[in-house]
A protein has these predicted regions:
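Alpha/beta enzyme core
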Residues: 2-28, 36-52, 60-183, 189-193
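Cofactor-binding active-site loop characterized by glycine-rich and histidine/acidic residues
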Residues: 32
Length: 193
């Protein structure tokens, strides 16, 4: 979500569908509106409409933003250490998991990179890193993440060309880890994928 005006319709749609909903904010949106304001509005709407809502902070690269979100009442955070060396990504993600889990908050980690531009960070097609299944096993085991975002060829942002999503790679990763997988960057993904 990018503004408070979106929230009532999002939660109302979930109610009409009889479904829980995950509402995700970027760090920029959360800082602009205020973590506490977002949490208060989401809680009020969720309680008044009787809808289960998970409030998720997306692509946090520093611990302070994660702490701010958790302290305000977010129920889920993503630590994006995908640009870090593998071992450093594991170490920093593990610290986030320890902090978050002690407060009942779930954590998404990222392994591999997503192409395109988001939050001012650009990754070219040539620089995309695909998630290796063996690394995914190690990462999940050593960090304790609840969900894992994987690099399988998708892109953030608006693209005119189609992306080349590696579905066999996704299936292989899925077969070797025991946590749900998250795919970021659906822009340009072929309808059949």
């Amino acid at each position: 979500m990018h503004n408070l005006e979106m929230l009532p319709d999002m939660i109302r749609a979930a109610k009409e569908m009889g479904s829980p909903i995950i509402i995700q904010t970027s760090i920029d949106t959360a800082k602009y509106i205020g973590y506490n304001v977002i949490v208060a509005v989401v809680k009020e709407l969720a309680n008044s409409m009787l809808v289960d809502v998970a409030l998720h902070l997306d692509h946090a690269k520093d611990f302070d933003a994660i702490k701010d979100a958790i302290d305000a009442g977010y129920s889920s955070v993503m630590f994006d250490g995908s640009s870090l060396p593998f071992k450093e990504n594991i170490e920093k993600t593990r610290l986030v998991v320890e902090f978050a889990h002690a407060r009942g908050v779930s954590v998404e980690g990222e392994l591999g990179t997503i192409g395109g531009t988001e939050e001012g960070v650009s990754v070219s097609e040539e620089d995309k890193e695909y998630t290796r299944p063996a690394d995914a096993v190690t990462f999940v085991r050593e960090t304790g993440v609840d969900v894992l975002a994987v690099g399988i060829g998708t892109n953030h942002g608006q693209f005119k060309s189609k992306t080349n999503v590696k579905i066999p790679l996704l299936k292989e990763i899925h077969s070797v880890v025991d946590v749900p997988l998250v795919i970021h960057g659906g822009t340009g993904v072929k309808e059949e994928d």
